[in-house]
Each structure stands twice: as C-alpha cells, then as structure tokens.
From Swiss-Prot:
Segments of skewed composition (Basic and acidic residues): 85-102
Family under the similarity heading: Belongs to the DDRGK1 family.
Domain of life: Eukaryota
Disulfide pattern: none
Protein name as annotated: DDRGK domain-containing protein 1
Keywords, alphabetical: Endoplasmic reticulum, Membrane, Transmembrane, Transmembrane helix, Ubl conjugation pathway
Gene3D superfamilies: Winged helix-like DNA-binding domain superfamily/Winged helix DNA-binding domain
Compartments it resides in: Endoplasmic reticulum membrane
Lineage of source species: Eukaryota, Metazoa, Ecdysozoa, Arthropoda, Hexapoda
Gene Ontology terms, MF aspect: ubiquitin-like protein ligase binding
Sequence ranges of Low complexity compositional bias: 44-68
Annotated membrane topology: Single-pass membrane protein
Record topology, Lumenal segments: 1-5
Length: 287
C-alpha cells in the first residue's frame, strides 16, 4: 500500500510540473505579445524567480499529496473490502463524487449488515418458537403415553384380579369336591375295614398270609391291623405260633372265664381239652 501511495505522489508531482511548464510558457507568450518586444531578464533577477517557482511547485505537490494520503487512510479505515487504488485528482467535484460513492457504499454495507442481523434475529425467534412448540408436543405425547400406560396397568390389574377371583372360586369348588372325595375314600376305607373284621369273624381261624393276600396287604400290615383292632375292642382272639389268628367272640370269652371260675384251678391241658366245647372254631359259612 506504501508503494502505491508513493507512485501516486510521483504521478501527482509529474502532472504539476507539466502543468506549470505549460502555464509558464503560455504566460510568457502572452507577455511578449502584449509588449511587442523581447523580454530581456537579468541573470541576477531570474535566479530568485526560479527559486520561487521551485518553492511554489513543492507547495503544490504537498497540497496534491494531501488528498491522496487522506484517501489512503480512508481506505485503511474502510476495511479490506476496499480494493480501489487511489489516484491523484485535483478536481474537487470528482473527489467529492468518489467520497460520496464511498459513503454510499458504506451505508449500503451497513444496511446490508443490519438486514442480515435482523434476518438472523428473526430466524432465532422462529427457531425458539419451533423449539417451544416441539417441547409442548413432546410434553403432550408424554402425558398421553403416561395415561395410556396407566390405563393398560389398570386393565392388567383388573384382569389379574378377575383371574384370581376365578382361581379362588375354582379352588373352593375343588376343595368341596376333594372333601367329598376324601369322605368317599374314608367311607371306602371304613367299608374295607369292616369287611376285614367280618372276614376274620366269619372264618374264626385265618392264616395271616392268606388274610394279607385277600385284602392286598403285606403280612405285617395285616398283623398290625389285627393288633389295632384288638386295641380298639373290635376284634378279640389270639395269634398262635403257626401264623394263624383265632377269633374268640365276647360270649366265648365269658364262657371260658366262667369255666375257670367254676373249676377254681384249671391246668392248660384241661383247658385245651375243654376248649372245643367252650370255643367254636368252625367257620360261620360252614355251619
């Protein structure tokens, strides 16, 4: 930029010198025509004039260089967007037009910046409004989702409650049926036990193994059952060493007791000899 300024100053000086040359030449011609005689100057008088002319040229060069320097400073203040190369111009009207154009350009740029700023602000407001609308929509969707989940939860809870109530009703029904079934089983068990007792009473003498087979029991289970029935007083008798059970009724026991009481002292041999008369060992079905 300094090189351009120097070139401008040099061009301005050159223009001034050329202008002064033609101006001086024209003035000399006019003076020679006015007085109609050649002007003879003294060398002693011409030297100061030449010095004055040189001083005047320098002053005019400084005056011409001042607008160019001002133009350079204005270009520096205007920013990098001013790419024009300043040129020396001595016409005040032309310099005013350039300055006016520059001011108009600055004003236009300022207006453009303000317009862009306004557009950005409007866009920010629009974006903020859209963001607010998105937030409202998101909150609305979240509320609808919450209500939908709550409704689904209530529906699941209601369904679970109904299923639980149905389960309780079915359980109660099964319990009643099971109680009836248990009662039936108990009745069957009592019936089987009574059949067991009746079988022993009717046969009088039963082999324990055959008794177990008859009622689908193990031999030990049959023996245990007889022992329990004896404790309950529902059966009476003895189990001999040959694996048989001899049923003795209440009447027969009373007869044996009466026989022993009448005889006083009775031996086992005497009791065995009279047992056939006291105890009936014949099965009821065979009688």
């Amino acid at each position: 930029m300094d090189l351009i300024l120097l070139l401008g100053i040099a061009v301005a000086l050159l223009v001034i010198l050329v202008t002064l040359f033609f101006f001086t030449k024209g003035k000399g011609s006019q003076e020679s025509g006015k007085y109609n005689h050649p002007r003879v100057e003294n060398e002693a008088q011409a030297a100061p004039r030449r010095a004055q002319v040189v001083r005047n040229q320098r002053n005019r060069a400084r005056v011409a260089a001042a607008p160019a320097e001002e133009q350079h400073h204005a270009a520096a203040d205007g920013g990098s967007d001013e790419d024009e190369i300043p040129h020396a111009d001595f016409n005040g009207e032309k310099m005013g037009a350039k300055k006016r154009a520059k001011l108009e350009a600055k004003a236009e740029k300022k207006a453009l910046r303000e317009q862009e700023l306004k557009i950005r602000e409007d866009q920010k407001k629009k974006d903020a409004l859209l963001e607010e609308q998105r937030k409202v929509e998101a909150e609305k969707e979240a509320e609808e989702e919450r209500k939908r989940e709550e409704a689904e939860k209530k529906a699941r809870e209601e369904k679970a409650r109904q299923e639980h109530e149905e389960y309780l009703r079915m359980k109660e029904a099964f319990s009643v049926e099971e109680e009836g079934f248990d009662q039936e089983q108990e009745d069957d068990k009592q019936n089987m036990l009574q059949e067991f007792i009746n079988f022993v009473k009717s046969n009088k003498v039963v082999v324990l193994e055959d008794l177990a087979v008859q009622f689908k029991l193990k031999t030990q289970a049959a023996i245990d059952r007889i022992v329990e029935l004896q404790k309950d007083g529902r059966l009476s008798g003895v189990i001999d060493d040959r694996g048989k059970f001899i049923y003795i009724s209440e009447e027969e026991l009373n007869a044996v007791a009466k026989f022993i009481k009448q005889r006083g002292r009775v031996s086992i041999t005497e009791l065995a000899e009279n047992s056939n008369n006291l105890i009936n060992l014949v099965p009821v079905s065979a009688e």
